[in-house]
Amino acid sequence: MANIKSAKKRAKQTVVRNARNVAQRSMLRTAVKKVIKALDANDAAGAEAAFAVAQPILDRFSARGLIHKNKAARHKSRLNDRIKALKAA
């Protein structure tokens, strides 16, 4: 346990930030999974709607540094490619 006041504060901040990051990462994963679930069910309209929700979440969290910007771009690109392929089929 920290004895210095600033170290105690930093420990508290770490706990709060960790909890926030875990919640946000969970929200991100859920949004991406909804798109994948719609794609697996061959629901193009549902996949597009879920992608419209997931895309700004990916952008927002990559801007905040929760995930790397390239990972966000990769997710968006691959999901969009799958949606296009489903619509073409």
UniProtKB/Swiss-Prot annotation:
Keyword tags: Ribonucleoprotein, Ribosomal protein, RNA-binding, rRNA-binding
Gene Ontology cellular-component annotations: cytosol; small ribosomal subunit
Coiled coil: none
Any GO molecular function: small ribosomal subunit rRNA binding
Taxonomic superkingdom: Bacteria
GO BP annotation list: translation
Family matches, as Pfam families: Ribosomal_S20p
Homology family: Belongs to the bacterial ribosomal protein bS20 family.
Stated role: Binds directly to 16S ribosomal RNA.
PANTHER family: 30S RIBOSOMAL PROTEIN S20, SMALL RIBOSOMAL SUBUNIT PROTEIN BS20C
Descriptive protein name: Small ribosomal subunit protein bS20
Organism for this UniProt entry: Stenotrophomonas maltophilia (strain K279a)
Gene name per UniProt: rpsT
